[in-house]
């Protein structure tokens, strides 16, 4: 009777079950061949030999009795009795032969049934071997696919680590550039304040120069008026005027020198301001490029991290920081 195997979720357990069933069938066949057929055949051979010996013995007795009948002078009653006994023995022998024939037929039918069962078991064994081979090939394919998935997961993990390192480096560079931009903005503000102070100083010096020119003109007018009013005291006044005139002309020259220095400093500061603004624009452009690049790289990093988690057992939805 064919046994139905249990339902297994694991292929290895199913293989073990099929192998155990196959071994059990082989063992059953071996036991049947070793115990039943061999012993029964020996028994039948022995019984057949015994029956032949009995038949030969009865034949010898019959021959002996026939000889006795020819040579002896027995009565007809004794002869009939002997014949009746012989007939009874022959009937018994025929019954034994019929029973033996029936047994042999039954044994032949049983052997035929066992042979059919053996053929079925061998066919089932072939199917089981074929099924085991298919399962083994499927297991090898699954193992190869699993190995490839693990290798791909390792590559993705390494790529994820590399991208994280790049992001850390880019963030550090961006932070450093922001610090430099802040310093540059502070320097620009400081330069603007210095320019404003210089403009104020220039206006103040210009105002003081105009006042000084006005005061000198007033003094010159007063001096000319007093000169024409007092021509007689010309010698002393002339000497005094000659002494004061260089001093009056020297002061405007000193003011012009100061104004030229201030103008040069203003030009230098303007150049520094223009250079700082140009550098600020370049760094702002660099910062924008880094921000755009970071915005482009972050979705790729998120996708790689999610793909790495999907290769694990039931991953949770997690975003990289």
Curated annotation (Swiss-Prot):
Residues 234-253, 274-293 are annotated as: Disordered. Induction: Transcription starts around hour 2 of sporulation and requires sigma-E. One of its GO terms (biological process) is sporulation resulting in formation of a cellular spore. Keywords: Coiled coil, Sporulation. Residues 37-70, 108-205 form a coiled coil. It comes from the Bacteria. Residues 234-243, 282-293 have a biased composition (Basic and acidic residues). This is Sporulation protein cse15. It comes from Bacillus subtilis (strain 168).
């Amino acid at each position: 009777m064919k046994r139905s195997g249990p339902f297994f979720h694991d292929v290895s357990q199913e293989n073990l079950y099929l192998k155990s069933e196959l071994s059990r069938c082989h063992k059953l066949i071996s036991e049947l061949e070793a115990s039943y057929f061999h012993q029964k055949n020996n028994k039948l051979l022995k019984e057949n030999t015994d029956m032949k010996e009995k038949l030969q013995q009865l034949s010898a007795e019959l021959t002996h009795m026939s000889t006795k009948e020819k040579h002896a002078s027995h009565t007809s009653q004794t002869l009939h009795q002997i014949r009746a006994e012989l007939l009874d023995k022959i009937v018994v022998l025929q019954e034994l032969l019929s029973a033996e024939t029936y047994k042999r037929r039954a044994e032949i039918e049983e052997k035929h049934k066992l042979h059919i069962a053996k053929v079925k078991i061998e066919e089932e064994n072939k199917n089981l071997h074929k099924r085991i081979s298919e399962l083994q090939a499927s297991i090898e394919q699954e193992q190869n696919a699993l190995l490839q998935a693990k290798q791909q997961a390792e590559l993705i993990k390494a790529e994820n680590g590399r991208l994280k390192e790049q992001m850390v480096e880019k963030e550090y560079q961006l932070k450093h550039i922001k610090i430099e931009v802040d310093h540059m903005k502070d320097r620009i503000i400081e330069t603007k304040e210095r320019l404003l102070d210089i403009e104020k100083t220039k206006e103040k010096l210009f105002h003081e120069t105009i006042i000084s020119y006005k005061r000198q003109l007033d003094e010159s007018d007063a001096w000319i008026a007093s000169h024409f009013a007092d021509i007689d005291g010309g010698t002393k006044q002339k000497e005094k005027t000659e002494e004061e005139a260089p001093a009056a002309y020297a002061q405007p020259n000193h003011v012009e020198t100061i104004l030229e220095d201030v103008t040069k400093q203003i030009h230098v500061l303007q150049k520094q301001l223009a250079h700082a603004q140009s550098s600020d624009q370049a760094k702002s452009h660099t910062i924008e490029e880094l921000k755009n690049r970071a915005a482009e790289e972050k979705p790729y990093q998120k996708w790689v991290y999610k793909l790495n988690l999907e290769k694990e057992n039931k991953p949770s939805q997690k975003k990289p920081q």
